[in-house]
A protein has these predicted regions:
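Acidic/His- and Gly-rich active-site-bordering loop/insert found
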Residues: 2-4, 19-112, 130-136, 327
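N-terminal signal peptide c-region/cleavage motif recognized by signal peptidases
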Residues: 15-17
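Metal-dependent amide/peptide-bond hydrolase catalytic core
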Residues: 21-25, 29-32, 40, 62-66, ...
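Structural motif corresponding to alpha-helix initiation and N-cap regions
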Residues: 69-70, 152, 312-313
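Residue-level marker for buried hydrophobic side chains located in beta-strands
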Residues: 85-87, 168-169, 195
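Short coil/turn motifs at secondary-structure junctions
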Residues: 92-94, 147-149, 195, 262-264
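Acidic/histidine-rich catalytic neighborhood of metal-dependent amide-processing enzymes
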Residues: 120-187, 227-228
Length: 365
């Protein structure tokens, strides 16, 4: 019978169950505190303050302003800011806020998986290693950023710390697998220009909504590049707006979309989409591309983990440096951003052990 590396890791970690039981209560309490703190993107202050209050017991804590009242949290044991290994994740979440709830092994709430599960497990792992004496000052530091869900402004601001690390362990819901690579991203806004009028006389107006629908239908049909590693490039139309009343020909309409790119040729994707829109509506529709990022390759040279490739984009490329880049965390991306976002207690516990292993192995390199 063939046993997966993840199963092997889980079996090996059963020997640590007594120790795990000693931190499970504090792990779950921290996770609950974080999920209960509404930290919707652009309004992350409750989570920032909750983290600061918690971390000040065992760490030196620095709050770094990103913009306005939005702040990143940087923490480290002792007085030395520099560390060989950094653990990081994001504290912002997508709307709407969903309150914390627990039933047995399952915990629900906004951010339970993406990514407050990673935050709680990372902190607990570092605390456990500090308590056992396996790591100390100068070995590890923690960084928790705002704005990951809105383009990565928090992680970009973290470059202002002026620090470098040998390895950075990024926390996202990966089902406790090490990620080998993740897709790129490309956003666009599309607008349609109509002429308002009475709905009973459509021949005297021009419906921006009709124009927008025609363009979007074409964009959804057009073939986009695929690769063996990442599969298909995908397009999601996330927002549509337009019109003022059902009996008025819509004067304007707009949409916003996100593309998960399987190729580095983002300019090629832009060309395909622009041509498709022009073929359907050569006038009155405008396509403007917004934020973008290339696919990212990651490190996965630590034994004992299953590995995977994921379709989402992360903060990984926003942090400058020559460090090794590991992406790992509890929870599933398939429930992230959904009304049923959840995580299990056992997944959180396994993540603590996984993070401990990643830290210790990184310190050996």
């Amino acid at each position: 019978m063939k046993i997966s590396r993840a199963t092997t890791l889980a079996i090996a970690l059963m020997g640590a169950s007594a120790w795990a039981a000693s931190y499970t209560e504090s792990l779950l309490a921290l996770h609950k505190t974080l999920v209960e703190a509404d930290s919707t993107t652009k309004a992350e202050a409750p989570s920032t303050q909750a983290l600061k209050t918690y971390l000040e017991t065992n760490f030196t804590v620095e709050l770094k302003t990103v913009e306005g009242s939005r702040q990143n949290v940087y923490a480290y044991p002792g007085s030395g800011r520099a560390a060989r290994v950094l653990l990081t994740s994001h504290i912002d979440t997508v709307p709407p806020y969903i309150p914390y709830s627990r039933a047995g092994d399952e915990i629900r709430g906004r951010g339970a998986s993406d990514a407050k599960g990673s935050v709680a497990a990372q902190i607990t792992a570092v605390e456990a290693l500090l308590a056992s004496g396996e790591v100390g000052e100068g070995d590890v530091a923690l960084l928790y950023v705002v704005g990951e869900e809105s383009g990565g402004e928090g992680m970009r601001a973290a470059n202002g710390l002026g620090l470098a690390w040998d390895a950075v362990i990024f926390g996202e819901p990966t089902e406790n697998s090490l990620v080998r690579a993740h897709k790129g991203v490309l956003g666009f806004n599309i607008t349609a220009d109509g002429v308002a009028g009475h709905s009973g006389y459509p021949e005297y107006g021009r419906s921006a909504i009709d124009l927008l629908i025609g363009a979007l239908e074409r964009l959804l049909d057009v073939p986009l590049p695929s690769t063996e590693e990442f599969g298909n490039t995908t397009l999601n139309i996330g927002v549509i707006e337009g019109g003022i009343a059902s009996n008025v020909i819509a004067e304007s309409a707009a949409g916003r979309a996100s593309i998960r790119a399987a190729t580095e040729d983002l300019e090629g994707i832009k060309g395909i989409l622009s041509k498709a829109v022009a073929e359907v509506t050569p006038e009155y529709v405008d396509l403007v591309f917004t934020g973008q990022g290339l696919p990212v390759s990651l490190d996965y040279d630590i034994e004992g983990f299953n590995t995977t490739v994921v379709n989402y984009y992360t903060d990984v490329p926003q942090l400058n440096g020559t460090h090794k880049r590991y992406l790992y965390g509890p929870g599933s991306i398939l429930v992230a951003h959904s009304a049923d976002e959840k995580i299990t207690v056992s997944d959180l516990e396994l993540a603590v052990e996984g993070y401990k292993k990643l830290i210790l192995e990184s310190l050996k390199k």
